[in-house]
């Protein structure tokens, strides 16, 4: 299974690199990155869309039609529309989320930005995101971009990852620690 995951990462990296270089050559990095962020949000919000791109049962042509129609309707840049068509035609739609992530990471590295992956029990408000961004900018000394997601299993609190550092202040982790401490006493 790990070799499959490594393959997905390799595919995602190669496609993201090609997209990045094309967007850079055409001076469209900002528009392409904005479109990819929009696509990421769509994927995060729509289970149906995630199933369409991940399903091996749905044919290449149907995936291509779905992705290009979505890109057209969303008003994505020509580079993104063509890219999604090629990805679907090559039957690599399953790797689109990884491609988006790899592209955005490459762009952030070029701009000297760091991405903080924040998983919280509930969706963060704009004020919370702003406060976290300010605190993380100060703590890291870099410009921090927040990639927020929700995992209700955390029960409360959040997990923040910046590079190789992680701070877990989730309620589920605190309860697990308490449970372990109580077992040690008894």
From Swiss-Prot:
Entry keywords, A to Z: ATP synthesis, Cell inner membrane, Cell membrane, CF(1), Hydrogen ion transport, Ion transport, Membrane, Transport
Topology relative to the membrane: Peripheral membrane protein
Entry's localization field: Cell inner membrane
Entry GO terms, CC: plasma membrane; proton-transporting ATP synthase complex
Single Gene Ontology MF annotation: proton-transporting ATP synthase activity, rotational mechanism
Pfam families: OSCP
Cross-referenced SUPFAM superfamilies: N-terminal domain of the delta subunit of the F1F0-ATP synthase
InterPro entries: ATP_synth_OSCP/delta_N_sf (IPR026015), ATPase_OSCP/d_CS (IPR020781), ATPase_OSCP/dsu (IPR000711)
Domain of life of the native organism: Bacteria
Stored PROSITE patterns: ATPASE_DELTA (PS00389)
Family the UniProt entry places it in: Belongs to the ATPase delta chain family.
Biological role stated in the UniProt entry: F(1)F(0) ATP synthase produces ATP from ADP in the presence of a proton or sodium gradient. F-type ATPases consist of two structural domains, F(1) containing the extramembraneous catalytic core and F(0) containing the membrane proton channel, linked together by a central stalk and a peripheral stalk. During catalysis, ATP synthesis in the catalytic domain of F(1) is coupled via a rotary mechanism of the central stalk subunits to proton translocation. This protein is part of the stalk that links CF(0) to CF(1). It either transmits conformational changes from CF(0) to CF(1) or is implicated in proton conduction.
Subunit note: F-type ATPases have 2 components, F(1) - the catalytic core - and F(0) - the membrane proton channel. F(1) has five subunits: alpha(3), beta(3), gamma(1), delta(1), epsilon(1). CF(0) has four main subunits: a(1), b(1), b'(1) and c(10-14). The alpha and beta chains form an alternating ring which encloses part of the gamma chain. F(1) is attached to F(0) by a central stalk formed by the gamma and epsilon chains, while a peripheral stalk is formed by the delta, b and b' chains.
Designated name of the protein: ATP synthase subunit delta
Native source species: Rhodospirillum rubrum (strain ATCC 11170 / ATH 1.1.1 / DSM 467 / LMG 4362 / NCIMB 8255 / S1)
């Amino acid at each position: 299974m790990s070799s499959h995951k490594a393959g997905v990462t390799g595919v995602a990296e190669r496609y993201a690199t090609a997209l990045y270089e094309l967007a850079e050559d055409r001076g469209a990095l900002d528009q392409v990155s904005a479109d990819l962020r929009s696509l990421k949000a769509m994927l995060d919000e729509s289970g149906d869309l995630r199933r369409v791109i991940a399903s091996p049962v749905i044919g290449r042509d149907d995936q291509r039609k779905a992705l290009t129609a979505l890109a057209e309707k969303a008003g994505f840049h020509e580079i993104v529309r063509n890219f999604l068509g090629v990805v679907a035609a090559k039957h690599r739609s399953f790797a689109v989320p990884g491609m988006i992530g790899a592209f955005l990471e490459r762009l952030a590295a070029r701009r000297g930005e760091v991405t903080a992956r924040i998983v919280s029990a509930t969706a963060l408000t704009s004020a919370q995101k702003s406060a976290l961004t300010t605190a993380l900018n100060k703590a890291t000394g870099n410009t921090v971009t927040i990639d927020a997601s929700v995992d209700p299993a955390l029960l409360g609190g959040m997990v923040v990852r910046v590079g190789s550092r992680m701070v877990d202040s989730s309620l589920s982790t605190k309860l697990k620690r308490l449970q372990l401490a109580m077992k040690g006493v008894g």
